[in-house]
Amino acid sequence: MSDTLYWHVSGQGPDLVLVHGWGMNGAVWQQTVDALEADFRVHVVDLPGYGHSAHCHAQDLEEIAQQLLAEAPKRAIWVGWSLGGLVATHMALHHSDYVSKLVTVASSPKFAAAKEPVLWRGIQPNVLSAFTEQLVEDFQTTIERFMALQAMGSPSARQDVKQLKQAVLSRPLPNPDSLLAGLKMLSDVDLREQLPEISVPMLRLYGRLDGLVPIKVAKDLGRALPHTEQYIFTQSSHAPFMTEADAFCSELVSFAQK
């Protein structure tokens, strides 16, 4: 079996890379691909350990990056959702010749909440450790719980969960080692101090109702990164590209064309 990552490439135009989040796979982006492939050459990857790349594995962001570099286009617009936002941000910081613009979706430079040295909103560490424990026992149920958590608060929560579940089940299930490694990244990674080093234009997209990346994060980063752009989807929770698909795509297109 090949040890390279699975990529799906379609459309014509400037290169645009879509990176999914924890427990998911590239199929979550199908609506986005359908809308954008008339204007972009869209590259959708299954990250190591997920979907059609379930046979691969990576322990940290740089290991993921090294596997992405094998087939990633140069000078592309990178769009990363949730954990994928950490991956895309890491690419912009450490492999900047591959990234012309950076878009993070419902993502945070530090997913875990902290009280010290300053208050930082995010996922409570005990929630992340509970997911880790549950994952060892029953990873399918854990992923389903995470899907429900992602959609919670959105007016279309039931439809969002259904779409996420269909996407995950349409491809091979993720491997448990990669799921654990991903949770460790969500718990441990903190890119806040590195963000000002990003040299490419950056757009940060958020869902107003997101329970995993609280809207306060958008405000804090807006102050810390005044040169970046941000947009908040008022009806969305953690998956604005599904809940407000048309508005999401139009934000991407207008940022790409600037």
Swiss-Prot record:
GO cellular component entries: cytoplasm; membrane
Catalytic activity reported: 6-carboxyhexanoyl-[ACP] methyl ester + H2O = 6-carboxyhexanoyl-[ACP] + methanol + H(+)
Subcellular location: Cytoplasm
Pathway: Cofactor biosynthesis; biotin biosynthesis
Protein known as: Pimeloyl-[acyl-carrier protein] methyl ester esterase
Functional description taken from the UniProt entry: The physiological role of BioH is to remove the methyl group introduced by BioC when the pimeloyl moiety is complete. It allows to synthesize pimeloyl-ACP via the fatty acid synthetic pathway through the hydrolysis of the ester bonds of pimeloyl-ACP esters.
Alphabetical list of InterPro entries matching this protein: AB_hydrolase_1 (IPR000073), AB_hydrolase_fold (IPR029058), AB_hydrolase_sf (IPR050266), BioH (IPR010076)
Gene giving rise to this polypeptide: bioH
Organism listed in the record: Vibrio atlanticus (strain LGP32) (Vibrio splendidus (strain Mel32))
PANTHER family, per database record: AB HYDROLASE SUPERFAMILY PROTEIN YCLE, MONOACYLGLYCEROL LIPASE
Residues binding substrate, per UniProt: 22, 82-83, 146-150, 238
Enzyme class at the top of the EC tree: hydrolase
HAMAP family: Carboxylester (MF_01260)
Domain AB hydrolase-1 residues, every copy: 16-244
Subunit structure: Monomer.
Single annotated GO MF: pimelyl-[acyl-carrier protein] methyl ester esterase activity
UniProt GO BP: biotin biosynthetic process
Similarity remark: Belongs to the AB hydrolase superfamily. Carboxylesterase BioH family.
Annotated Pfam families: Abhydrolase_1
Stored Gene3D superfamilies: alpha/beta hydrolase
Enzyme active site: 82 (nucleophile), 210, 238
Keyword Cytoplasm: yes
